[in-house]
């Protein structure tokens, strides 16, 4: 088929605005799936995606549409994740398209991720077609959304297509708009091969498979290809496209979207954003914008209950084959035994990894408090160390010249009645207000700069509970900044517990330490000897609690008689408890670790 009849597009939307349903309808309308294959969220293949109603992995589907002008067009739909953790993947998917459908829920209006993804599409020079979805809902307010499209995004509201993916309204109009408004791909099949990888997955039979958009040249089985970021070479075994099923083709040429399999053993060799070219006749320039995946949040994952360290290691290895964004290294802790320090893209990514490990690989795990990467510059040296684990943070504050932590720009869109409490929350989280505007009389747009460490614990839950679920937010990394941070260590009977170290802001240290000590007092069971809980900052104790010992009634067998007899027995007991305290070990239950994660 000629290149002028090809269209590459993606759908961008906030979580839950009906993206996957619209994709299903387009596939049905163009006959890509038969009646028999219909099911909800056809492109969301992971269990987690279906249950949470979110898209994590991307898919790229080919379909054919006979337009009103009598020509048949080849359409490639690239489905993108909507969540902030996967923003780099979204940017690569947009780079593979010429146009985008911007989907907006008629009852919710424009939300934070709508705006964030809209600007990403504008940066890539895509043609944007606004679609107002869910117009069949009783709460739909189309005029309000049109006004927002004009005022917030600066698009012509009359160009917006009214649709309901669920009822199948407006689907033909959308397909006509894709054909008429989105330009065909430019590219020269005669030039050397240049293909952008925008997703990958692991197939037990084909090895690691790359989903690509071909910009120049063509590729067929038997070709020798090279990955430009690593210089590794492979021989192509199969090329094809998803028509939702994986379908083999003889070749892929300029303008096409499809997959390349080359019996690559490790999915990590296929990096999202990398460029594939021919080994013998490579292209001069790779596709711009490649970045290796960079974890923002780290946490310790340890085996729990009857899972062994080996089982956890095998599960992580298998999982990492499919998720190139995760990094992990072994670590051990006297309190929790052997485990791993794992890096994630963000909090949602972390939850999904935990859930998939437990569900798909059957391991039971315990996760320590998530933390970000701090940069510590020591005095008298030029070296800056990256601290991924609070245990590695230097104890002696006198040796530290400065500490930096990652900051993010948070954008929040909320109904106006919740503005007060949300501003208060952002101030508690050390946020600095940068902008506040009214999108319409009832909706407010806020911008804050705040530390990532404040967001990763409970910011999402708090914002949703304050606004009864109506507010939405999005954040992007803006760089490292100096902060007044200190390390707190928990001592139990004067012995430090490594897994209970925290890095907190100096202003909060006192309050935080007190809460930790109280929580531990509630969760550590009473022993036969007194337990002292202390929270120290640089060797100085700033909060402490004690758990009284259990004791037998040693004077029960004395009937009357001399008081000195009772005194002697009590003195003996006291001596025994003292010795016990010296040599006794306190076993910390798992609840003790978990309770401290929830401390504010």
Curated annotation (Swiss-Prot):
Subcellular location: Cell inner membrane
Example of a GO MF term: ribosome binding
An annotated GO cellular component: plasma membrane
Signal peptide range: none
Record's keyword annotation contains Cell inner membrane: yes
Keyword Acyltransferase: no
Function: Required for accurate and efficient protein synthesis under certain stress conditions. May act as a fidelity factor of the translation reaction, by catalyzing a one-codon backward translocation of tRNAs on improperly translocated ribosomes. Back-translocation proceeds from a post-translocation (POST) complex to a pre-translocation (PRE) complex, thus giving elongation factor G a second chance to translocate the tRNAs correctly. Binds to ribosomes in a GTP-dependent manner.
Protein name (database record): Elongation factor 4
Organism from which the protein derives: Aquifex aeolicus (strain VF5)
Species lineage: Bacteria, Pseudomonadati, Aquificota, Aquificia, Aquificales
